[in-house]
Regions:
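Active-site C-terminal subdomain of aminotransferase-like
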Residues: 1-125, 129-157
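PLP-dependent enzyme catalytic core of the Aspartate aminotransferase-like
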Residues: 76, 133, 142, 158-211
Length: 211
């Protein structure tokens, strides 16, 4: 897990509510972060005190990998969104698919909103329904070759799950409906593989599932 702190330095820490930033820090040469560091008070406290105490410093190689991931995120997201849109369009034209929930599809009620606030793409995680219900959904999952059957999302690999038979299998049909999940709902997280491989895998698994 990694994270980034962005501090504009404009918050008034000297308002009586943050003594740890105002009073001298005896563990760090008696420094007063607000008085001695000015706008860098908060970020200096994180770096000089909290990071030191909790030990959340990663190895040089892991730091390098984290930076590489962050610096190339925008490039990967372009491919994620490009592949996801093509998959959504492909599924929306398949006669064995009952619905596709993807905001960039023209018939989505969120289309105009998505294009206004997410002009570069609306992500790569979405759901669709496969005619044949729960049984077809399970069969579809079992016959995929490219997709990995796991519950997480956002990987560079394409991922899939059938909630009704896995993550939400403890719910009754009525409870599934209340949760906004149909028995034929399948969740996809589209990865960076070649789009032809992704579409081929979906088609062959759908064909088998609805036989």
């Amino acid at each position: 897990m990694g994270g980034i702190v962005v501090d504009g330095g404009n918050f008034n820490w000297d308002n009586g509510k943050f003594p740890c930033l105002v009073e001298p820090d005896e563990s760090y040469h008696g420094i007063s972060y607000v008085k001695d560091c000015g706008k860098a008070a908060f970020i200096t406290k994180l770096r000089a005190h909290i990071l030191r105490d909790i030990g959340a410093s990663i190895s040089p190689f892991n730091a390098f990998m984290l930076l590489m991931g962050i610096e190339t995120l925008s490039l990967r997201m372009q491919k994620h969104c490009e592949n996801a849109l093509k998959v959504a369009e492909f599924l929306s034209k398949n006669e064995n698919v009952s619905f596709v929930n993807y905001p960039f599809l023209p018939d989505s009620k969120y289309n105009a909103l998505a294009k206004r606030i997410l002009p570069k793409g609306c992500g790569a995680v979405f759901t669709f329904g496969l005619k044949g219900g729960k049984k077809a959904g399970i069969k579809f999952i079992d016959n995929l070759k490219v997709f990995s059957h796991v519950a997480n999302v956002g990987d560079v690999r394409s991922l899939v799950i059938h909630p009704a038979s896995t993550t939400h299998s403890q719910l009754t049909s009525e409870e599934l409906k209340k949760a906004g999940i149909c028995e034929d709902t399948i969740r996809l997280s589209i990865g960076l593989e070649d789009i032809d491989d992704i579409l081929w895998d979906l088609k062959q698994a759908i064909d088998i599932a609805v036989k």
